[in-house]
């Protein structure tokens, strides 16, 4: 594979127009933010309610297993990011290894357009977080924002307006001040991390008695701390039951360190070398320690029963954050925890907006997507890509809020990303076979094959349990439509390029410009 920068006949232009604004800290922040630790900690109860059984579901062990399954992907992204530090990094090496048709169609389905329903999901997660925080602080008027749209008392219109307004504001920031967009993510991540630390310390200081007093103080008929703890009689760990939660960790956390590689041409210094392994380690601790704290303070039996109790989860938004706020002895502490929860979730949204525009830019550079999507303003922002993302995502927020009412209605669409990551692993293995020697070759091939196997398994889990993972018409229809759209678009663009006298496939044999 050549490494020269080809002329304008191959790529749309000779430079992306983006600048190197992303430090190592920024890269870690955007990776961990995109790994959705805030959502993973706050939405677990809704998934526990959907499981066929919660007997033996251990979230700490589940997080450990999921992190272990992510190790091959970590190796792949670390090694390949050093070789392809470009905009849309994993798309670049996958399309160069597996060919333009496979690379273009799978990326359009699995990342470029899949990110939009994911952002819609996260936008609604932010709304639910704001509503739950308001309730925990004593503002009962915010109940409508905290409840899923299919639950009596919910306010789908308010959820749509708030979620869409927040999304519009973040898109405008990235259009007008793209450098500020990266700095906001780092700020949100830092504030969110502080909130998680405060929550953990608050729970540890409150102890078992604090949890008992909080639950009993809710005055829920027939529901006390003791009754919840006694209602669970199963083991503390069952492998089969815990493995049912693997798609949950895949939905929100461990696969998503493609964030920093997607802005590869904007990374400064050593950011492209170390951001992936550091991000995986940081995300593991941020997710696992809170779950472990809940088990330690509240007890495994109580925590499992509470996270699968419909009244606590649906009506009181029970999760790690609300429990910590509930046991807090002062308003300031509760507010700090609530703020951390909200901004940690907003950070996911903030970077999702950036990453989708980078994949659009990369694919338009290869002449697969329309050239207008590659337009970069004088401020260094891919404006048209942002506006397209804005239009589609706002529509999906509305569909999820009004027609389906639950976050899980969009879960199924994330299956497309599992397919994408499987092909990314396969692409790395093919690249290793063709271009590497010795230890590097063996490492890339083995890690790539293992990554492909892990995500094939996760795709199967999504399909095998549609009732848990949002196997709705909206989700599956979106995945199928985007795949066929990609296939048709590739055929059309190739036909147009052939008539114009240049071969579109040449782009997939060269490394694109920075």
Per-region residue spans from a language model:
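Membrane-interface "cap" regions at the ends of multi-pass membrane proteins
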Residues: 1-60, 64, 70-75, 220-224, ...
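Membrane-interface loop-to-helix entry segments
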Residues: 22, 158-222, 255, 279-284, ...
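A generic transmembrane alpha-helix motif of multi-pass inner-membrane proteins
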Residues: 44, 61, 193-194, 199-207, ...
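Transmembrane helix-loop boundary segments of multi-pass membrane transporters
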Residues: 47-63, 138, 144-156, 178-188, ...
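Helix-loop-helix junctions that connect adjacent transmembrane segments
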Residues: 142-153, 157, 186-334
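Hydrophobic transmembrane alpha-helices that form the core helical bundles
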Residues: 46-47, 71-79, 83-167, 345-359, ...
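Hydrophobic, small-residue-rich membrane helices and short re-entrant helix-turn-helix hairpins
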Residues: 14-21, 89, 176-187, 255-291, ...
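TM-loop-TM module centered on a large, flexible mid-protein loop between adjacent transmembrane helices
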Residues: 92-95, 99-100, 137, 141, ...
């Amino acid at each position: 594979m050549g490494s020269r920068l080809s002329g304008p006949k191959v790529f749309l232009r000779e430079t992306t127009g983006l600048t190197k604004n992303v430090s190592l800290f920024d890269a870690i922040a955007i990776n961990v933010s995109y790994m959705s630790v805030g959502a993973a900690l706050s939405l677990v109860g809704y998934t526990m309610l959907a499981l066929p059984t919660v007997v033996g579901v251990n979230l700490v062990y589940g997080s450990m297993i999921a992190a272990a399954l992510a190790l091959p992907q970590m190796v792949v992204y670390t090694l390949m990011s050093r070789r392809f530090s470009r905009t849309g990094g994993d798309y670049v090496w996958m399309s160069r290894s597996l060919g333009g048709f496979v690379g273009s169609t799978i990326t359009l389905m699995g990342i470029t357009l899949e990110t939009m329903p994911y952002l819609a999901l996260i936008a609604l997660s932010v709304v639910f977080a704001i509503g739950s925080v308001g309730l925990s602080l004593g503002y009962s008027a915010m109940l409508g924002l905290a409840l899923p749209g299919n639950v009596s008392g919910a306010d789908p219109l308010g959820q749509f307006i708030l979620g869409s307004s927040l999304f519009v504001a973040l898109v405008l920031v990235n259009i007008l001040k793209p450098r500020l967009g990266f700095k906001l993510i780092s700020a949100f991540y830092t504030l969110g991390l502080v909130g998680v630390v405060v929550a953990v310390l608050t729970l540890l200081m409150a102890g078992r008695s604090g949890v008992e007093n909080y639950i009993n103080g809710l005055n829920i008929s027939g529901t006390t701390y003791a009754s919840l703890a006694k209602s669970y009689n199963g083991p503390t760990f069952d492998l089969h039951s815990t493995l049912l939660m693997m798609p949950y960790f895949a939905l929100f956390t461990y696969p998503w360190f493609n964030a920093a590689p997607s802005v590869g041409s904007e990374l400064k210094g050593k950011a492209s070398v170390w951001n992936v392994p550091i991000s995986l380690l940081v995300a593991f601790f941020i997710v696992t320690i809170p779950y472990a704290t809940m088990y330690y303070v509240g007890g495994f039996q109580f925590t499992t029963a509470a996270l699968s109790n419909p009244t606590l989860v649906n009506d009181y938004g029970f999760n790690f954050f609300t429990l910590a706020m509930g046991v807090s002895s002062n308003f300031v502490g509760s507010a700090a925890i609530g703020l951390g929860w909200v901004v940690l979730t907003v950070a996911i949204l903030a970077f999702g907006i950036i990453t989708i525009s980078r994949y659009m830019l990369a694919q338009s550079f290869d002449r697969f997507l329309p050239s207008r999507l590659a337009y970069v303003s004088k401020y260094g922002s891919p404006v048209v890509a942002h506006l397209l993302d804005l239009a589609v995502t706002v529509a999906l927020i509305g569909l999820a809020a009004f027609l389906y009412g639950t976050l899980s209605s969009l879960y199924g669409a994330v299956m497309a990303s599992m397919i994408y990551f499987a092909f990314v692993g396969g692409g790395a293995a093919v690249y290793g076979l063709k271009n590497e020697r010795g230890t590097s070759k063996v490492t890339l091939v083995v890690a790539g094959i293992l990554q492909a196997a892990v995500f094939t398994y996760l795709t199967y889990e999504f399909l095998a349990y549609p009732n848990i993972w949002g196997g709705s018409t909206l989700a599956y229809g979106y995945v199928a439509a985007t795949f066929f759209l990609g296939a048709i678009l590739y055929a059309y663009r190739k036909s147009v390029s052939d008539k114009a006298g240049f071969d579109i496939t040449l782009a997939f044999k060269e490394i694109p410009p920075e």
